[in-house]
Amino acid sequence: SYLTDKEITDRLVTEAYNRMQEDVQVAHILIKTNPNVATDTAAAYTKIQAAYKRLQAGEAWDLVVKQTSEDNPTKETGGDLGYVTALLPNGFYAFESAAYETPVGKYSMPIRTTLGYHIVKVTNKRPARGELDIAHILLRVKADGSDDKAVKTRIDAVYAQLVAGDRFEEVAKTVSEDKATAERGGAIGPIAINQYEKSFEDAVFALANDGDYTKPVRTRLGWHIIKRTRKRPTLTLEQAKRKI
């Protein structure tokens, strides 16, 4: 009936809204499945259950990850995926639920996603970082890093200009080597977690107030100074209902 559908929808929206208040740092063990091969799914299920039994028997998480996980980029680092936040993409609701419902330091039972079977371990939780509008000044460094020192000297001089009172937007227009954003005063727009390199993200979310800017930050592209122009207000439940 309509009412039960609406009740289910409301419950899911409220759940998503509550989850959006927190970011969760997770690690995982992944056994991949090929959805086109039925026997493959059964074999993968057997493997994930074997890994789960090893954990239950007290074996170290990192060792079991290293020896069993099929997620090559993370298996050498304890399966660490960094922080995630609701809403995860379609097909990952079970993963999201495991992340939010498992206590810090514990791991979930095996769960299924479109990738395969996972065991999810929660390593930390923090208040959600939310979204910021930001701008930046970028001075590029060559891929081989040969001019890193010279560029660092230049960005330090730019930082000194800002400290002396020069307007961020004007300086960005004049010196920034990110052509796409320089002409609009360095404005990038909104940033949420997992969109930029960790050094960049951590620096900008550490800024306490609108209008504050970072000291020079190094990424693969070069040296940045990043300004927080506005913290986007946290949605109310009613606003979230319209968005979700």
Question: Which stretches of residues belong to each language-model region?
Answer:
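Peptidyl-prolyl cis-trans isomerase
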Residues: 1-244
